[in-house]
Amino acid sequence: LLLKAYKKVPGGKVAIYGQVKNAQTWALCTMNMFLHGVDDARIWQGDTLSNPQNLEDDHLMTFQVVVANPPFSLDKWDSGFLAEAELDSKGKIKMAAELDQYHRFDLGVPPSSKGDYAFVLHMLSCLDSKNGRMAVVLPHGVLFRGASEGIIRRHLIENLNVLDAVIGLPANLFYGTGIPACILVFKKNRTCRDVLFIDASGEGNYEKGKNQNILRPCDIEKIVQTYHARKAVDRYAYVASFQEIQENDFN
């Protein structure tokens, strides 16, 4: 994913930073960077959530562009924090926002059984405050699940105004899971409050494969052009006002 983004930058004038928990994946990523001539990429190995390595003077580094395809609904994402946790009223160990020294979860703590918004909040904390933008691949549940996730989603839309677009993807697009996913696009310092919704999961917007569906180059180009145009397209795209989203309880 980082290499794909790297190749989209004219002249390759970009610095690459990344972190992955699995040691084998880290080794493959590092080798892949080297084989593609990216010798100065800084790829760290470790838990991105409980032990982020992108630090400067004990603060999270910030970036103009952040992209990720984190594991869907990661269970026990908070396990790296719990050594410092206290028992709650029911005698259970529970993650709390104050356990994170980087204040990434001040908007709300995602449920232990679903780490999707933990990654979103981490990525947002690493965004440049002036012109940062990010895209993250997530399961559809992030769009409607309630409780703490609903509170976080509302803060992101109502108070921070950082959600720029939601791109629905076809089912069976990724290895290891057949569930449909979406891409959430976030931007800092947005001048509007509406959100663009693109439904790229419909018939004709992808190629059906025997074992896996595929987004063809023409399908990807259609998504990109629609995102930049930011206009409604019949049965494909819709620009929802903040009031509409609010009336739908931020789902």
Predicted segments, located by residue:
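Conserved SAM-binding loop of SAM-dependent methyltransferases across substrates and taxa
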Residues: L1-G11
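Short alpha-helix immediately C-terminal to the canonical SAM-binding loop
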Residues: L2, Q24-L28
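Short, surface-exposed basic-aromatic patches at helix termini and helix-loop junctions that form
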Residues: K8-P10, L35, R154-L160
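Short acidic capping loops at alpha-helix termini that bridge into adjacent secondary structure
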Residues: G12-V14, D40-R42, D194
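Conserved SAM-binding motif I beta-strand of class I
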Residues: A15-V20
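S-adenosyl-L-methionine
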Residues: A27-L60
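A conserved structural/catalytic subdomain of Rossmann-like adenosyl-cofactor enzymes
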Residues: D57-N251
